[in-house]
Each structure stands twice: as C-alpha cells, then as structure tokens.
C-alpha cells in the first residue's frame, strides 16, 4: 500500500471515530512511527509502505480512534517552542497557556531592565559598569508537567524557579522536563502553598510510578529545602504564576472524550463554579509575594469579571488586568501585591 493511501485510510478511521483534526493526527502518527518529519512525508507519499509498517500504523490509529490523546501516544507535546514529556499523570500543555507564559516573561524581562536601570542611575557610572541585574524568584503553582516554569527558566535570564504540585507523579514528569530542557528548578510537593510552608523538596528523579505515600518505587524520599529559610520566615517570591484547575464540575461531562477520560481529574475539576482554587490562591498569595510582586493566573473564557471582583475584594492587590486570547476571550488575569503606603 502506498504511504498516501495508508494515511488516507488512517484519516478515514479517525474521522469515523469522531476524532477532530483527523488528517493532522493521521500524519503525525505516521511520522511518530517512522521517525520522519512532515516535509519528508510529503516528499515520499508515493512510496510503498511495507506490511510491518502498515500493521504498526493501524495499531496506533486504533488507539487514537479509542480517543486516547495523540500526546499520550507520542509521549510529547511542544510548548513555547520546547519539547515536553507528557503522560496521563499531567495535563497536556495547551497553546492557550502560552499567553500566560508570554505575559509573565515580558513582565520579568521588563522588570529586570527597569530595576537595573534605576539602580545604575542611583549609584553612578561605576556601578553601571560592574553590577548585574537582580535575580527574580518565581513560583509555578500547580506546575503539572512543568511547562510554565521550565519555559520561563528557558526564556528569562537570572530567575530562580520553584515549582510545586500536590501530585508526586506530576512532579516526576516535571523533573524530567527540567532536565530535558537543561534548566534548574526546585520542586516541592504539597497542596498549593502548603508545599512552600513545609519546604518538602521533591527529588526530580523520583519514579513517575510512585504512589501518594512517598517517593516510592525507585524514587528518592523528600528532603528539607531552602524554602524553610531561617526560623519561621516565609519564602517570598517576585512572581507567582499558576494554571490551576478551573473547569466547573458540571461541565466536565461535556468535555472531549480525550480530556475527561484520559487527563487527570485533579488538574481539571475547579469545584461547583470552577473558582475553588482561585479563592484559595488569591486569599493566600499575598503572604508569599514580595511587596509589589506579581500574580499571574490562567482563567476560563468567562471567569474574568469573577476574578476581578475576587481580587479587588481582598484590598491587598492592585486593580487586576484581564488579558484576552486572539478570539477576545478571557485568558489571563494579572495583578500586583500592594506596596506599603
């Protein structure tokens, strides 16, 4: 069978199973199987595929037709131009989340430049020649695969990233992604800010199959981290970024099969109104932000006004800004911890 005919049959089977983007997925699966890219595929579509390739290809098509996400079959997802490992233990990084990373990175880069300039102006020419811009401490809360924290560490110079998640399995994947992308990140395990309070650092080499009672398997145990600081002093950050669970519980049943049946419910369910995690984060984040520190949150398409009110009602943050995606829908909210008057 010619490669062109093989892929066309794969596309037909995926379309029949209700898979969106069946054409793209049929090609991606062939490229994954054979190790070629789509340019090479295009140039060689008239070549004959051997029987072994046909059988292996249709097994992948069968798996995708059962609505297993493409990324769970290939084991990877591109995000911000970097490759990330994914598994059923983490939410697959979405293109929409790149807006959060882009806005956070822009703020860090601009802040670094303005802070360095202000210090140079204050201290004179000699200081300008030999001083370094400040290092920023960033917390990636509910880090999942680590896509946000790893991307920020790749894009921004002189930042120190801490990433936390309640799932040890997710942290194991995030640790692999940090190593894969050659960035240093400190991983801590716990429920939102409880991870920062306890200072329990997660070994990023921990076994992805580890259970919830400890590192388990071949993974290593938790050990005290620098987050404990001295005495009872709390670690504070220049920026907290988070893409927490924000889907209404009643909406989960109508999600695509790939999402509701194959991605971790822990990363999806935001409670009855989808705002449970935001309430907790907004209520506590000011205790972990430095004066003037930034809070960036990814939000649902219709949650902007609810988040704006929630933030303003605390009286602890600046007037929040709602950032929209290309379709004009709510996507990110950002605000700053108020500085003392």
Give residue ranges: language-model regions.
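Basic polycationic patches enriched in arginine
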Residues: 112, 123, 128, 217-220, ...
